[in-house]
Amino acid sequence: MFKIVYPNAKDFFSFINSITNVTDSIILNFTEDGIFSRHLTEDKVLMAIMRIPKDVLSEYSIDSPTSVKLDVSSVKKILSKASSKKATIELTETDSGLKIIIRDEKSGAKSTIYIKAEKGQVEQLTEPKVNLAVNFTTDESVLNVIAADVTLVGEEMRISTEEDKIKIEAGEEGKRYVAFLMKDKPLKELSIDTSASSSYSAEMFKDAVKGLRGFSAPTMVSFGENLPMKIDVEAVSGGHMIFWIAPRL
């Protein structure tokens, strides 16, 4: 049996909503270190990882590691109840699945929902082990504009370094998109260890950026020479939502 309390119900369901961009069912793994969920698209191009360490949880108790598989439609029924940042969310294991309590700490209002879930063994949390030479941080709104633009002109986007700038391009002659990103214009941070360039699916980039919605925090994007792109946002109340996009070689 397990019981966890996360201090921000809105952030927690932003995690869940992000994963639904990749899968129709969600597997939550409860371990001694915290909670994680990892999902791949069928073509194995896009990976979504939710990772919430136990030290950011208001309460965390677990008898033994376990996983629960939830249907997305069931989870989305309760998303509307988690609109307040003042609300906490409590997950408790039951014989048939999960009991979810959303409690508004300001008003004292409480909602309790029971969801059926398939229980199983904890999955292995594996992700690409690569050294990414380029890292930059910006707001989700900036990435959202880029994602919308590149998908309008082509199926593939190319990202590269050019001196102290990031260059993003897509499309062919006559229908082409080019953007340059620099420190403070509009990047918050920029680190280039070595020059690099790589190409990715524009649609998968758009799907990953869509998964960032709901997190009011800057996003870090990392890439290397023909290596997977990593998109990482840390929730205000703790925990990371990470997307990996395989390169087009």
From Swiss-Prot:
For this protein, the record's CDD domains field holds: PCNA
Keyword DNA-binding listed? The answer is: yes
Q: Does the keyword DNA-binding apply?
A: yes
- This protein's source sits in the domain of life called Archaea
Keywords from UniProt, A to Z, are: DNA replication, DNA-binding
Q: Which Pfam families match?
A: PCNA_N
Q: Name one GO molecular function term.
A: DNA polymerase processivity factor activity
Q: Name one GO biological process term.
A: regulation of DNA replication
Cite the record's note on assembly.
Forms heterodimers with PCNA2, which then recruit PCNA3; does not form homotrimers. The heterodimers interact with RfcS homotetramers. Heterotrimer which circularizes head-to-tail (head is at N-terminus, tail is at C-terminus) to form a toroid; DNA passes through its center. Replication factor C (RFC) is required to load the toroid on the DNA. Heterotrimer interacts, probably via this subunit, with flap endonuclease 1 (fen), Hjc, Dpo4, and XPF.
The protein's role, per its UniProt record: One of the sliding clamp subunits that acts as a moving platform for DNA processing. Responsible for tethering the catalytic subunit of DNA polymerase to DNA during high-speed replication. Heterotrimer stimulates the Holliday junction resolvase Hjc. DNA polymerase I, DNA ligase and the flap endonuclease may be constitutively associated with the PCNA heterotrimer forming a scanning complex able to couple DNA synthesis and Okazaki fragment maturation.
Q: What is this protein called?
A: DNA polymerase sliding clamp 1
Lineage, please?
A: Archaea, Thermoproteota, Thermoprotei, Sulfolobales, Sulfolobaceae
Designated gene of the protein: pcn1
